[in-house]
Amino acid sequence: RLVEVVQHIVVRRTDCGTIRGISVNTRNGMMPEIILIQTLIGRVVAENIYIGSRCIVVRNQDIGIGLINRFITFQTQPIFIRTPFTCRNTSWICRLCYGRSPIHGDLVELGEAVGIIAGQSIGEPGTQLTLRTFHTGGVFTGGTAEYVRAPSNGKIKLNEDLVHPTRTRHGYPAFICNIDLYVTIESDDIIHNVIIPPKSFLLVQNDQYVKSEQVIAEIRAGTYTFNLKERVRKHIYSDSEGEMHWSTDVYHASEFMYSNVHILPKTSHLWILSGKSCRSNTIHFLLRKDQDQITMDSLSNGKTNISNLLERNDQVKHKLFRFNTFGTKEKGISDYSIFNEIICTDHSYPAIFHDTFYFLAKRRRNRFLIPFPFQSIQERKNERMSPSGVSIEIPINGIFHRNSIFAYFDDPQYRRHSSGITKYRTIGIHSIFQKEDFIEYRGIKELKPKSQIQVDRFFFIPEEVHILPKSSSLMVRNNSLVGIGTPITFNIRSRVGGLVRLDKKKKKIELKIFSGNIHFPGEMDKISRHSAILIPPGTVKKKKCNKSKKIKNWIYVQWIATTKKKYFVLVRPVILYEIPDSNNFVKLFPQDLFQEKDNLELKVVNYILYGNGKSIRGISDTRIQLVRTCLVFNWDDGKNSSSIEEAPASFIEVRTNGLIEYFLRIDLVKSNTSYIRKRNEPSGFGLIGDNKSDRINPFFSIHSKGKIQQSLSQNHGTIRMLLNRNKECRSWIILSSSNCFQMRPFNNEKSHNGIKKDPIISINNNGPLGIALQVANFYSLYHLITHNQISIIKNLQLDKLTEIFQVIKYYLMDENDKICKPDLYSNIILNPFHLNWFFLHHFYCEKTFTRISLGQFICENICIAQMKNRPHLKLKSGQVIIVQMDSVIIRSANPYLATPGATIHGHYGEILSQGDILVTFIYEKSRSGDITQGLPKVEQILEIRSIDSISMNLEKRIDAWNECITKIIGIPWGFLIGAELTIAQSRISLVNKIQKVYRSQGVHIHNRHIEIIVRQITSKVLVSEDGMSNIFLPGELIGLLRAERTGRALEEAICYRALLLGVTKTSLNTQSFISEASFQETARVLAKAALRGRIDWLKGLKENVVLGGMIPVGTGFKRIMHRSRSRQHNKITRKKKLFEVEIRNLLFHHRKLLDFANFKEFM
């Protein structure tokens, strides 16, 4: 095959005139000296070589060993040499591009069949090496690595904090240390200390028993002696079915667009959370929602008839009312009870439910989230206000009613620095907002009216007010006139000028200064005494003198009586405030509400904060807010709008890569206490206590008297919807109690391992998606057990702390490791901004090793607590979904260790089946240097077969690179340079890969032999459809040089794509159909040539041998060239037409072929 593809390559010219070359760097370290000598020896220089300003080698000079030594000595600039890649001839090669002959030390002679020599030079060593391997049995090539071995039998002791898990270069689990690690091996009679150097692999674990001379570590400080290695891909498959989660150490964004491959920057764990996956069709998906409860057997049984459904309903009711009423400590039922939800299920989708399968409970999804940009807790601990000035008002009990004020905004244009009087007309009064229903966020108490008054415009009459003690010595008198800066007392001066009015009371003196103009009315002026009126702008006429006065603005006329008979009128200025219907409050409040239904109504209303005619008194330099813009919250629940009157609120804090976002979640649900039993009924089932919390956190179960135990058997589960890119086929996962286990670290029962499997586990509303705590009833300590994400407005006082701590003897420890010992006789203030609260039992727990928080992932056999006279408590691997007073409920999960450079298949939260590929490792594997492994790779390269996997995004990368090149150098040259660089780089890469195999066996083949082969398999391009061309058809396979010359001659851009053909395909795509037919597929090639009318010009060796003619090499080549040169000279001297010259330059090789055909006819 090698000879077949290059049999027509013959040296037919001395110089092709090319100015291109390949760069070779002669500096130290860039290339080994032996390889450099083999690369340069026998080559021809493409450009002059200078040392400073002196030229040491001229162009087209061949390189010998003397010149190479000078290059290495002087370390010149990169040398450009001519190679078969740079030759401009299409079907043959010139002497200067080939170089010296391998037979003698001069340039190769004309007519030498260098193609045949190249094929033999590559194929013969491979055959000899293969025969040697078959006879000798192969050659072993390996290396050594430095290991640390155990000096004796014993148990390993080390500091686990100084190591972290990783994998060796072979893909096996290990530990790595960054500093010197001291390892102790304890045996019965002696203790050995071993020092492990940094960056070494530790192959054993703590407390592991090792034998003498066992390898415990591999030192990585030195260099490896493994010279021959290969990269191997190792896939890790999921052992169980479930949901995939990972930490922030994994890039959540995919490596490429539209792919599910994620890159791991550092060592991390992947988790498969247990759960049963199911596929849902379109009809079932309309019924199944997130957090719904369903029976597991319905998944296998399919449809259920009505009779079975009724029986199961009775069974559920029997289960519901069969409670232990003898005072046993039980867990409480959650907000979404079986009884309540069955009632709701019967009213919705009755026919469809009976025809499909049985729902145990239906989760209400009538809620929404409201994001608001809080500032950091450290900056503003006493105030919760966003930078935009919008404040959120939450009722104390955490329950919103209809038409409640949800948020407010104080517009700066309605703020005043001075005191005054407000006057307005009333549009509407809303008296349902009481003052005691609100929490003040600003740290100071603000006076609020009992009702909110809505107006369209109002008037503000400014005045200066001073409240002075009765013992103050005044420097002004009543009804006197003062100017600006007039002393009132020794340390108070007036800020405005006007009339002074004094009002003396029992313990204080109220001093007011009214600014304005004084008017003395006549006897006939009919102005009602002892009254104050507002006069609009316009013209005022006097009846006595028939004079009129024009008023531009509103004025406030006030009657002032000095004595019983003397009086005057004070005309005071008025400031008019217009309240527009629309404002920018909605723009300040975030509009991206995550609501599940379009039932939220937010209405913007402006309320005035002070009564009509009421005097407003400013304190020192504080500003007075006259109007408050409020956001009134309401909802519409369709048919059942009258049934839902309360909406409990809860705060959610979401942390992502250190960023904290706060959300307020409002659930439009109805309390289930009304139709379970009467609240004050002493007997019964006691679902909700009388004076206890009516709203239970969905992540906890409260232990108290009268509570019942909500149990879920093995065949019950909770649905969790999963994100799926395919909308037509959505998937969901069932989380049942069989996927969880319960551990009770603080109970009095004795257990060997501290782990107790409890199939009776309530998992209502459990899941690792977030933590939501109710705002109401914070006095209950059950809300402070876990990693609390509580975001409330200010420090909260626990009113019932004494009663709780008399029963529960625990200490509180916050995130700063401060232990709060409760005082039974005083209330304790807990700072909710410390979000990590932990309970330490004062009797049982001596030392805590691992803190357990909600949502935390725990590996297997991690000790969480040490008990007195008891073994360590260890957990199974999983995720903590419930943290209770005396137990921890963990969802089973399998961890997988992944090292840097690994690729993860699948998205975060995606469901995986058992046996799916989870992660792919790329590690090194030592291999032997046998030629039996090398030759197949050479054959794969020359036949262009895929060795390694190709990137999924390779085509998009090339397109993006071409766009950048086009922007830099312009459109006409973008395609040319892109294809040229692609072909040139591919040729160099193929030569290096083939040489690597032969050099590993000590076989030295000159690069030009391989370059001739590679030149032929990369000499074809495929005409693309990107550009319109009238010369070649789209999809046509043509030569690269022919495409370039045709485009330059016709000044037309020809779009083509670089193409790699194997030696077999290249041999079947030549200009000689005789050569193709004698190689493979004889009948097909001859039939196709006949249909196309192909002409064979007989320019190669093989076709002349087949037909019995003279081959164009050696002496036969000299005779052909002598005839053709003489005929060519006569033609050119006889006809000097420009068109004929252009055509001959265009079809340069065809001119030679015509001459050769004429010569054959002459013979």
UniProtKB/Swiss-Prot annotation:
| Recorded catalytic activity of this chain's protein | RNA(n) + a ribonucleoside 5'-triphosphate = RNA(n+1) + diphosphate
- List ligand-binding residues for Zn(2+): C16, C87, C94, C97
Please tell me one Gene Ontology term that the record gives under cellular component.
chloroplast
Q: Which GO terms describe its biological process?
A: DNA-templated transcription
Report the main location listed first in the record. Answer: plastid
Using the UniProt record, name the top-level EC class of this enzyme in a single word: transferase
InterPro entries found in the cross-reference section: RNA_pol_beta''_euk, RNA_pol_Rpb1_5
Provide this UniProt record's keywords sorted from A to Z.
Answer: Chloroplast, DNA-directed RNA polymerase, Metal-binding, Nucleotidyltransferase, Plastid, Transcription, Transferase, Zinc
Q: What is its EC number?
A: 2.7.7.6
Give the family from UniProt: Belongs to the RNA polymerase beta' chain family. RpoC2 subfamily.
Function, in words: DNA-dependent RNA polymerase catalyzes the transcription of DNA into RNA using the four ribonucleoside triphosphates as substrates.
Q: What is this protein called?
A: DNA-directed RNA polymerase subunit beta''
The gene for this chain is rpoC2
